[in-house]
Amino acid sequence: MRRDVRILLLGEAQVGKTSLILSLVGEEFPEEVPPRAEEITIPADVTPEKVPTHIVDYSEAEQTDEELREEIHKANVVCVVYDVSEEATIEKIRTKWIPLVNGGTTQGPRVPIILVGNKSDLRSGSSMEAVLPIMSQFPEIETCVECSAKNLRNISELFYYAQKAVLHPTAPLYDPEAKQLRPACAQALTRIFRLSDQDLDQALSDEELNAFQKSCFGHPLAPQALEDVKTVVCRNVAGGVREDRLTLDGFLFLNTLFIQRGRHETTWTILRRFGYSDALELTADYLSPLIHVPPGCSTELNHLGYQFVQRVFEKHDQDRDGALSPVELQSLFSVFPAAPWGPELPRTVRTEAGRLPLHGYLCQWTLVTYLDVRSCLGHLGYLGYPTLCEQDQAHAITVTREKRLDQEKGQTQRSVLLCKVVGARGVGKSAFLQAFLGRGLGHQDTREQPPGYAIDTVQVNGQEKYLILCEVGTDGLLATSLDATCDVACLMFDGSDPKSFAHCASVYKHHYMDGQTPCLFVSSKADLPEGVAVSGPSPAEFCRKHRLPAPVPFSCAGPAEPSTTIFTQLATMAAFPHLVHAELHPSSFWLRGLLGVVGAAVAAVLSFSLYRVLVKSQ
């Protein structure tokens, strides 16, 4: 909604434009009227809509055509004033003033217009019969108000309707010629209906209607008011009420009725409560509230976020089998402009016979939050988190402390850990990721797939952690400055092909050797005969030289579910990186031996000194 309103008064000379402004401000009819009133600003606290309002007068005698065009360009709404006792001023509305305001607008939004029939004190009847054909011809005309500056009749109402035309415009909502909601409005209201339909029975119960009413307007409907609403719908819409519940058709009809009766602010209140702008698009503030993620920090869903997305899951799991079928998932995504999760989903999380279980669903949310928190905020926005939870979705996100602090303290508080699986093409990275999801080669899709992610939970010292595996090619890391940052690096080589180890060794030296990221070399295809290195150190010798854990053999051959031991090891290394270095540093063994020798020597010296003291005392 706009933060201020600029109203421009136009019309023929002597129709009373200036008198209307002065009567509003002075609350009495002015005895002397200047050719043009100065621009006035009405403070927000004295206007019904609580928005500051600027009122601008126009005088054809004092202002040029260029100044007029500039004022029209700046105006949010134009009041075309005519004299109800002068037919000629009414005709000028059609032939002069409306073409001046919107004549150059062939496409896009037009400036809303309020017709103002002044000097009603000089005419006994109404001018509406003459004005109605003009209102029918020009859809940008919001309404017509007859008033009298002399008698102060309808002066406040005039400027209220002008404000309303800006803050609650009819044009984006309703097509007066077709007498129906515009498609964008119907689409937005349909999404709101689906979010409010908590049991997904395609209708709003009294409880759901009251929750909706309270969310939008601050108070529930009285029982009789609820019955009256349903009665009106029943009389006008076939199928608008089903089993005493309001259907989507009934909901859309009610909003159409509000607009037709001039209460379009009601529909706008609903739309804005659910995040819509004047253009009937979800606002940036609604979809992406401010959240600061400093360098070295990561983002995770907190308990509020997990509770919300789990409620959404349970809402759409209509058969209560603990998993979302493709149809149920499509229902969940119906409030999005497009499905947010693509065909890569089955390769990213655990699924069950084409269905998405709660565990895999929560894993996917965790992955999106970690990799792209802006997308996560947007997804929560489309699901109505800010409205349904009455707080912006940044409250559902935890920003972790800097990784540097984790390294200093020797442990991490993070629940989500990132492992980059690095290796040359063909070493089995994709198979490794799928093995993490419990799929052996017998259950995997052998078609070529782009590098991706896999996420699952792993137990680390009795705590559940989310481990993300990210597939990275060695060529990319060696040829570019691609970000190699992660919590643990899994350097994978083909144990049957000695050449593939050289790629991993180069990546280690280039990116990880001088850093604090724990690394684990993995020898894939362990079911095949081990290759013999032609020259250079063997993988085991390389790891000993660089104080790294010994290479771990791995194979996912066969239909059985692969072992999870290696994934637990990776997660533990990521959670406690200092333990890796402490246990493997050769100096620690040397130091232990040295301390043993020194300890024995100190004990001998102390014993000898004690002996001398005892001898002297005798």
Swiss-Prot record:
Top-level taxonomic group: Eukaryota
Keyword terms, alphabetized: Calcium, GTP-binding, Hydrolase, Isopeptide bond, Magnesium, Membrane, Metal-binding, Mitochondrion, Mitochondrion outer membrane, Nucleotide-binding, Repeat, Transmembrane, Transmembrane helix, Ubl conjugation
Residues where GTP 1 binds: 16-19, 59, 118-119, 121, 149-150
Residue sites binding GTP 2 per the record: 426, 428-431, 525, 527, 556
Cytoplasmic side: 1-592
GO BP of this protein: cellular homeostasis; mitochondrial outer membrane permeabilization; mitochondrion organization; mitochondrion transport along microtubule
Broad enzyme group: hydrolase
Positions with a binding annotation for Mg(2+) 1: 18, 35, 57
Domain EF-hand per the UniProt entry, residue ranges: 184-219, 304-339
A GO MF label: calcium ion binding
Matches recorded under PANTHER family: EF-HAND CALCIUM-BINDING DOMAIN-CONTAINING PROTEIN 7 (PTHR46819:SF1)
Function in brief: Atypical mitochondrial nucleoside-triphosphatase (NTPase) involved in mitochondrial trafficking. Probably involved in control of anterograde transport of mitochondria and their subcellular distribution. Can hydrolyze GTP. Can hydrolyze ATP and UTP.
Protein's UniProt name: Mitochondrial Rho GTPase 2
